[in-house]
A protein has these predicted regions:
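His-Asp phosphorelay/catalytic-motif detector in bacterial-type signaling
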Residues: 73-75, 99-103
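Helix N-cap/capping motif at the beta->alpha junctions
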Residues: 58-67, 88
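Short amphipathic alpha-helix used as the core "switch/output" element in two-component signaling
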Residues: 67, 89-100
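Non-catalytic signal-transmission and effector/linker regions of two-component phosphorelay proteins
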Residues: 1-31, 130-154
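Active-site residues of response regulator receiver
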Residues: 80
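Receiver (REC) domain active-site loop signature in two-component systems and cognate sites
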Residues: 83
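Conserved acidic segment of CheY-like receiver
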Residues: 28-40, 45-49, 77
Length: 154
């Protein structure tokens, strides 16, 4: 790859910037599923992660994300918390039943995500920290099946 992309959020606007490849470690190829009701965020996540060699599936709703996870082998899931129809908590519960070994990263622009929702995921990233934390968290989670043990009780 000739360059990598960096995601930055400034004044609520997601920006994509090219960066030299030498600033990022090589990551293992994997299939990632991104679920977010904001199409612009999905496109930025997809471009960013594909620049590192990941195969990225995207879904604008929780039900579409679950449908994709049932049809494809998914190695890791990235889901927004605040979405219409199904929120990230509901998606995480269903995803754990569908893909119990796939780590789940929850994203949110707000920090008031209920503790109960966080029990179903392996990591939480505030959207304003996405640029600096997404790749390190993916790298850590890809090195193990789950970051912490789960009881998976609703």
């Amino acid at each position: 790859l000739n360059s990598f992309l960096s995601l930055n959020i400034e004044n609520g606007i997601l920006k994509v910037e090219a960066m030299p490849p030498s600033t990022h470690p090589e990551l293992k190829p994997a299939v990632l599923l991104c679920i977010d009701d904001n199409e612009d965020v999905l496109e930025c996540e997809k471009s960013f992660l594909e620049s590192f060699g990941y195969t990225v599936l995207t879904a604008a709703t929780g039900s579409k994300g679950l449908e994709l996870a049932s049809m494809h082998s998914v190695d890791l899931v990235i889901v927004d918390y605040f979405m219409p129809e199904m929120n990230g908590h509901e998606v995480a519960i269903a995803m754990r039943r569908l893909r119990p070994k796939a780590p789940i990263i929850m994203l949110s622009g707000a920090l008031d995500v209920p503790e109960q929702a966080l029990k179903w995921v392996d990591a939480f990233i505030a959207k304003d920290r996405l640029a600096s934390q997404l790749l390190p968290v993916i790298t850590q989670l890809r090195g193990c099946e789950c970051l912490t043990p789960h009881s998976y009780e609703a």
